[in-house]
From Swiss-Prot:
Binds 1 Mg(2+) ion per subunit. Binds 1 thiamine pyrophosphate per subunit. The gene is dxs. This is 1-deoxy-D-xylulose-5-phosphate synthase. It comes from Escherichia coli O139:H28 (strain E24377A / ETEC). Homodimer. GO terms for molecular function: 1-deoxy-D-xylulose-5-phosphate synthase activity; magnesium ion binding; thiamine pyrophosphate binding.
């Protein structure tokens, strides 16, 4: 979309933060209004993360107005809320390409702009990185300031508290801004806090505070009285005790939609020494009523008509794999009251909404706490229950030690339902489920299954749920199922694949949901096609049979080739001294960028045409 200067006259004056800082303060509320409307206009046309950015417009304007970015370093946690930041930092006219192949990255990305200090996508990393950046800036000695913006969801993760605990110890000069969009505060309390925040962050108060500490440092009772008086004044209206105890100077909560008030407070806090904490209250979806009322639905949106106030309904076609999992979960829970389901803040994405409503006493959303989720599941298993951890492939990485140390070593029967395995599409490098087979396959006695369709997915979930000799995992992709008939649930024989088609000379060993394309290739090349089903334990007898009866083997998986299922096949052949040629097809040794799943599979040669071309070139 082209930028309409007439529609956004103030925003038209701002294509960089230098231009932003030339505007008079009085024009900033109008700029915020135009920025919010432009965000609505552009994202509704292109798709993308939506509600979070609407809530951070004033904060973004205020931060770039007060701080000398990019010299001063601004770090966004996760990045869902950073669209206004991108618009104000030279990417205004490209915002319509966000999350598209070759377009703007969906999150702040160091390779895209000097304003993007930290590449992000996963949560709760900003404060840790910010401390390191602040320490480096202090050693550099150029008076460079550091600001981290983190949301109320991300700050609940243990990593954020580990970082704040460290900051309180080494006391770097930095500001943490908590963007709190979960609570609401009355106008009176909000006004009082705004006024108090400006007083408490001002130079006069800060100098008196430090001076008082020095004067009365030798008089412990008076020093303690002053401390308690300050805490009492703050405690009447603010919930900052925790952050103060961690060593931060806490200011807030303040109205995050009052751009002029934010500027005053930020200017006051900019030159304060030590770790500072500003708590702002915002409304997710601010300025677009449907998103304000339902911020979860409008968190990330497809293309839609803003005038309709609703998102387009799905076509009513095939169910997603997440839906298949959710239905199986409810079906199984109705028959077994030992089932417990756990998610780290991904209820909607993992297909668990219905389960959470039907079985609230057996549903646990542990927030953004993947490590805790896995060890919590271990505890449930020790207590005699049957825990299922529903988690995205990319987020399971964050709990690897817990899988290994707290579950696998103890041979606990925890089932991992790994969603978004393989290529996920528009979220790019940080969210591709490229590595789970590689990092799980090396764990002793772990059972790993890769369904080729939705019926196999259900059977594998059932098999894993009833496997009691240790942990098991079923990995399935983002997107819709293929439309096969769902048969009654039954346990699969562990570690056994099945031959789907008999051919000559070439055998294709398929792992997972690339099966439809692999089947087309097998038909075209008259190759044998095997649905391996299990990555661990591998069906060694079937692999050796294929090696003995064919001239060459091809393995197919939507996982990194290095350490993946194909590597496992290679290991089996080498261990048995079977020098048959093997071509491993999978994800290459680089981080897969954004694009639709179809676009990226075609580019990487993981669709039928690409696979066939690779095989023919290899055989030539």
């Amino acid at each position: 979309m082209s930028f309409d200067i007439a529609k956004y006259p103030t925003l038209a004056l701002v294509d960089s933060t230098q231009e932003l800082r030339l505007l008079p303060k009085e024009s900033l509320p109008k700029l915020c209004d135009e920025l919010r409307r432009y965000l609505l206009d552009s994202v509704s046309r292109s798709s993308g993360h939506f509600a979070s950015g609407l809530g951070t417009v004033e904060l973004t304007v205020a931060l770039h107005y007060v701080y000398n970015t990019p010299f001063d370093q601004l770090i966004w946690d996760v990045g869902h809320q950073a669209y206004p930041h991108k618009i104000l930092t030279g990417r205004r006219d490209k915002i319509g390409t966000i999350r598209q192949k070759g377009g703007l990255h969906p999150f702040p990305w160091r390779g895209e702009s000097e304003y993007d200090v930290l590449s992000v996508g996963h949560s709760s990393t900003s404060i840790s990185a910010g401390i390191g950046i602040a320490v480096a800036a202090e050693k550099e000695g150029k008076n460079r300031r550091t600001v981290c913006v983190i949301g109320d969801g991300a700050i609940t993760a243990g990593m954020a508290f580990e970082a704040m605990n460290h900051a309180g110890d080494i006391r770097p000069d930095m500001l943490v801004v908590l963007n709190d969009n979960e609570m609401s505060i009355s106008e009176n309390v909000g006004a009082l806090n705004n006024h108090l925040a400006q007083l408490l962050s001002g130079k006069l108060y800060s100098s008196l505070r430090e001076g008082g500490k020095k004067v009365f440092s030798g008089v412990p009772p008076i020093k303690e009285l002053l401390k308690r008086t300050e805490e009492h004044i703050k405690g009447m209206v603010v919930p900052g005790t925790l952050f103060e105890e961690l060593g931060f100077n806490y200011i807030g909560p303040v109205d995050g939609h009052d751009v002029l008030g934010l500027i005053t407070t930020l200017k006051n806090m900019r030159d304060l020494k030590g770790p500072q904490f500003l708590h702002i209250m915002t409304k997710k979806g601010r300025g677009y009523e449907p998103a304000e009322k339902d911020p979860i639905t409008f968190h990330a949106v497809p293309k839609f008509d803003p005038s309709s106030g609703c998102l387009p309904k799905s076509s009513g076609g095939l169910p997603s794999y997440s839906k298949i999992f959710g239905d199986w979960l409810c079906e199984t829970a109705a028959k077994d009251n030992k089932l417990m389901a756990i998610t780290p803040a991904m209820r909607e994405g993992s297909g668990m909404v219905e389960f959470s409503r039907k079985f609230p006493d057996r549903y646990f959303d542990v927030a953004i706490a993947e490590q805790h989720a896995v060890t919590f599941a271990a505890g449930l298993a020790i207590g005699g229950y049957k825990p299922i951890v529903a988690i995205y492939s990319t987020f399971l990485q964050r709990a690897y030690d817990q899988v290994l140390h707290d579950v696998a070593i103890q041979k606990l029967p925890v089932l991992f339902a790994i969603d978004r395995a393989g290529i996920v599409g528009a979220d790019g490098q940080t969210h591709q489920g490229a590595f789970d087979l590689s990092y799980l396959r090396c764990i002793p006695e772990m059972v790993i299954m890769t369904p080729s369709d939705e019926n196999e997915c259900r059977q594998m979930l059932y098999t894993g749920y009833h496997y009691n000799d240790g942990p098991s995992a079923v990995r399935y992709p983002r997107g819709n199922a293929v439309g096969v008939e769902l048969t009654p649930l039954e346990k699969l024989p562990i570690g056994k694949g099945i031959v789907k088609r008999r051919g000559e000379k070439l055998a294709i060993l398929n792992f997972g949901t690339l099966m439809p394309d692999a089947a087309k290739v097998a038909e075209s090349l008259n190759a044998t096609l095997v649905d391996m089903r299990f990555v661990k334990p591998l069906d060694e007898a079937l692999i050796l049979e294929m090696a003995a009866s064919h001239e060459a083997l091809v393995t197919v998986e939507e996982n990194a080739i290095m350490g993946g299922a194909g590597s496992g096949v290679n290991e089996v052949l080498m261990a048995h001294r079977k020098p048959v040629p093997v071509l491993n097809i999978g994800l290459p040794d680089f981080f897969i960028p954004q694009g639709t799943q179809e676009e990226m599979r075609a580019e990487l040669g993981l669709d039928a045409a690409g696979m066939e071309a690779k095989i023919k070139a290899w055989l030539a």
